[in-house]
Amino acid sequence: VPLAALAPVPGLALYSASKFAVRGYSLVAGMELAEHGIAVTTICPDAVQTPMLDQQKDKEQAALTFSGARALIVQEVVDAILDNALKNKPLEIILPTMRGGIAKAANAFPTIAARQVGCSVNKK
């Protein structure tokens, strides 16, 4: 589930909404299944360098997707699963942590975030 599950992404309403739903379902499943010894970890990576990401690079509505320092590589997500999710079984892993924190803050303060996003997206 990408970082779009943590904060609304202007221009990608349906995509963002579907990711919010998957994250919510996964977190609840993890909570409910824990009593049965079943772990569910939701992995929320930032943009990952894949062919799907390449298709978005020229689309204006995807500007926030490319606002980070760099796209993650697939191996970074794999490492998070192998080194953290399978060993520690947290409910959620966010990659990278700093962008995840920013996304969560944007979700907590949507009016402020909307103003900031509007400014940063329009300043190309």
For the regions a protein language model found, what residue spans apply to each?
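Short, flexible catalytic-loop segment of classical short-chain dehydrogenase/reductase
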Residues: P45-Q55, K59-A63
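C-terminal helical subdomain
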Residues: T42, L64-G100
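Rossmann-like NAD(H)/NADP(H) cofactor-binding core
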Residues: H36-T41
